[in-house]
Amino acid sequence: MLKRLLNFFKSKTPIQKMYPELEKVGGLQNAINIELEKHNSILKVSNDPDLVNIPFTYARIENGQKFSQVYIGAEEKLYLPDFWKEGVCLAHGKTQNISELGQVLDFWLCNNTTTKELAEKFSFVIPNEKALAFDENNEIEYTWNSILQDKSREEIHDFVKIAIKDEVLNSLFPFTSLYTLCFSRCTGYPYDTDNLPNVTPKQFENFAPVRTEKSFTQQYENKVETQFVVTKNKNEFLGVGNAEQALRIIKLNLPDDLRPARKGTADN
């Protein structure tokens, strides 16, 4: 009985059996460090105290304004890296080969390379849809147009159609939070929204629609103007009106020293 109990506690989990190379060296973080050393890389897995408890299944590697996170597959043996730059996730990859994982991490994090170049060199890397726009420094215009073309965001389209033509507002980076259209001084996350107004369709101002989808469609068919609520810092009410009026309210409440959105995050 005692022998069976000891064998039970010594038995390996399915993950450990699937990744013997990780089991051998004590987890994913150690294995990645070993691979990076093989390539004479300057990189090391981030020594974050919060990650100490998950050394086997997760790792984060940073260099300047770039970083990658690595996960592992639970049902199939796969190393799953992502590729971040200046607060934006630009690509994902999957490989069964930990040596390839070390190579792609070193190449991405230690070189001034585009996402396109990364994918051309490593066929297992798939750029995100927005990656090309960020590579070509066109992310602000791209994101404005993406919101305008997003059918799930029709409730803010009346406002976006005029805001996208405004030379001040269209130089900020737009993003949505629930039903609210927000603006940022930077193009990466976390965003810099301090003291910048945002706009919410009035029917969604309390985070719950007061109209059904059917009645919302009927509103468009009857050409009823959508009303927008403009706020700042989440709780300061600035005004309410149609799209044109909301734009005027926003511009009256923009900081005097406002500049076009920069690459990077609120932290840098």
Descriptions of predicted regions:
Residues 2-58, 114-190:
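Negatively charged, low-complexity tracts enriched in Asp/Glu with abundant Ser/Thr
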Residues 90-121, 223-268:
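Ampiphathic alpha-helical segments that act as solvent-exposed interaction surfaces
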Residues 64-104, 177-241:
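Intrinsically disordered, low-complexity regulatory segments enriched in Ser/Thr/Pro
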Residues 1-14, 163, 202-227, 265-268:
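Polar low-complexity intrinsically disordered regions
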Residues 56-66:
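Short, structured surface segments that line ligand/substrate-binding pockets
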Residues 41-43, 207, 216, 260:
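Short glycine-aromatic motifs
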